[in-house]
UniProtKB/Swiss-Prot annotation:
Residues found modified as N6,N6,N6-trimethyllysine: 7
A cellular component term, taken from the record's GO annotations: chloroplast
Reaction catalysed by this enzyme: 2 (2R)-3-phosphoglycerate + 2 H(+) = D-ribulose 1,5-bisphosphate + CO2 + H2O; D-ribulose 1,5-bisphosphate + O2 = 2-phosphoglycolate + (2R)-3-phosphoglycerate + 2 H(+)
Swiss-Prot/TrEMBL keywords: Calvin cycle, Carbon dioxide fixation, Chloroplast, Disulfide bond, Lyase, Magnesium, Metal-binding, Methylation, Monooxygenase, Oxidoreductase, Photorespiration, Photosynthesis, Plastid
Post-translational note: The disulfide bond which can form in the large chain dimeric partners within the hexadecamer appears to be associated with oxidative stress and protein turnover.
Annotated protein name in UniProt: Ribulose bisphosphate carboxylase large chain
CDD domains: RuBisCO_large_I
Cofactor binding remark: Binds 1 Mg(2+) ion per subunit.
Taxonomic source organism: Barnardia japonica
Length: 456
């Protein structure tokens, strides 16, 4: 009797998982995969294989399939289109029923969608380009601990981008000298300074010493400037328990913000830290160390916009998002695409910016994008125009490399930023008149003039 209706053996995935007539539901999680099949494998079979292996399928028919409703739980490849200008490359759209995923777990979502299928031998390469997260799923996540508006209110800073600086050299300084550099940068006019992503708790500088000296620097700079200051204290550690212990100590010192390396630390650790930060009034800065391992290849891995969406769900108030400046125009559009996905409530589908699906975040708070890496005062007009007010512009070498020292480097950046914001508010075109605006400001700021000379 057990054998009735059950036929053992291997059958093509497309017979079950390729359903071009399927109408997607509002509750489905939708994925866009860039699929490069092996020679001789049809696109439909490759797309169906991805849907199967990332949902209910396995390599052969099993009789326990009859004990559940595959129609209810299977992923479906519902549309395939060829990639223009690429030979044997396709975008496969897959719909996943919501019941396949644990609520509030980015870890489980990724384990399902990208956990197993990337090593599949029918595929030469596979890249997850985008995900549509339905409100019915995103609502199961807390999201960013505080979000953009709450951060502005905490800092009492409005109407301009925030300024940051990564302390260099990133490894080798003692805690006392590290704290001194933090103080000089904040005293000069920056809003934030930052631990580098690989500063955790090494023999030359243990975390507790660093936290204490940085807190002292923050309070001293606040007292002298009358502005609220912060330093991203990197709480990333070898265990979740140790990470939370460091965050607790940061809170006890009265620090306003901590930091986490969310890809090396992992999504489970990140979500735990985000929950702690919301409950205890700490802002959370996120560094994306290791992202290029996942997102750099154009035909394999995962696009950063997917990692950015996952971070917004898992929780973070800031995340690094590249700089755009000096890159290709196309990359600018792609970067601004995922910057919008981080900040806005509702983002329309726009393939020219790499956005494959309309994304509705409903009321989930936004994340502030951080522009960092190789930027200096001459880039300030472009950065102000491209990223707008809700951003952090981070100048590491562009502050600490100033010929007169750290504090004058900070002054130069603050003067350049204030000049750009004022010019923008007066209706001037930053893209066209940027260099002229910086030159005018440099006439009455010797610190800015010196910086302009070094990086001209």
């Amino acid at each position: 009797k057990a054998g009735v209706g059950f036929k053992a053996g291997v059958k093509d995935y497309r017979l079950t998982y390729y359903t071009p007539d399927y109408e997607t539901k509002d509750t489905d999680i939708l994925a866009a995969f860039r699929v490069t099949p092996q020679p001789g494998v049809p696109a439909e079979e490759a797309g169906a294989a991805v849907a199967a292996e990332s949902s209910t399928g396995t390599w052969t028919t099993v009789w326990t399939d009859g004990l559940t409703s595959l129609d209810r739980y299977k992923g479906r490849c519902y549309h395939i289109e060829a990639v223009v200008g690429e030979e044997n490359q396709f975008i496969a759209y897959v719909a996943y029923p919501l019941d396949l995923f644990e609520e509030g777990s980015v870890t489980n979502m990724f384990t399902s969608i990208v956990g197993n299928v990337f090593g599949f031998k029918a595929l030469r390469a596979l890249r997850l380009e985008d995900l549509r997260i339905p409100p019915s799923y995103s609502k199961t996540f807390q999201g960013p601990p505080h979000g953009i508006q709450v951060e502005r209110d905490k800092l009492n800073k409005y109407g301009r981008p925030l300024l940051g600086c990564t302390i260099k050299p990133k490894l080798g300084l003692s805690a006392k000298n590290y704290g001194r550099a933090v103080y000089e940068c904040l005293r000069g006019g920056l809003d934030f300074t930052k631990d580098d992503e690989n500063v955790n708790s090494q023999p030359f500088m243990r975390w507790r010493d660093r936290f204490v000296f940085c807190a002292e620097a923050i309070y001293k700079a606040q007292a002298e400037t009358g502005e609220i200051k912060g330093h991203y204290l990197n709480a990333t550690a070898g265990t979740c328990e140790e990470m939370i212990k460091r965050a607790v100590f940061a809170r006890e010192l009265g620090a306003p913000i901590v930091m986490h390396d969310y890809l090396t630390g992992g999504f489970t650790a990140n979500t735990s830290l985000a929950h702690y930060c919301r409950d205890n009034g700490l802002l959370l800065h996120i560094h994306r160390a290791m992202h290029a391992v996942i997102d750099r290849q154009k035909n394999h891995g995962m696009h950063f916009r997917v990692l950015a969406k996952a971070l917004r769900m898992s929780g973070g108030d800031h995340i690094h998002a590249g700089t755009v400046v000096g890159k290709l125009e196309g990359e600018r559009e792609m970067t601004l695409g995922f910057v919008d996905l981080l900040r806005d409530d509702f983002i329309e589908k726009d393939r020219s910016r790499g956005i494959f699906f309309t994304q509705d975040w409903v009321s989930m708070p936004g994340v502030i994008p951080v522009a960092s890496g190789g930027i200096h005062v001459w880039h300030m007009p472009a950065l102000t125009e491209i990223f707008g007010d809700d951003s952090v512009l981070q100048f590491g070498g562009g502050t600490l490399g100033h010929p007169w020292g750290n504090a004058p480097g900070a002054v130069a950046n603050r003067v350049a930023l204030e000049a750009c914001v004022q010019a923008r508010n007066e209706g001037r075109d930053l893209a066209r008149e940027g260099n002229e605006i910086i030159r005018e400001a440099a006439k009455w700021s010797p610190e800015l003039a010196a910086a302009c000379e070094v990086w001209k």
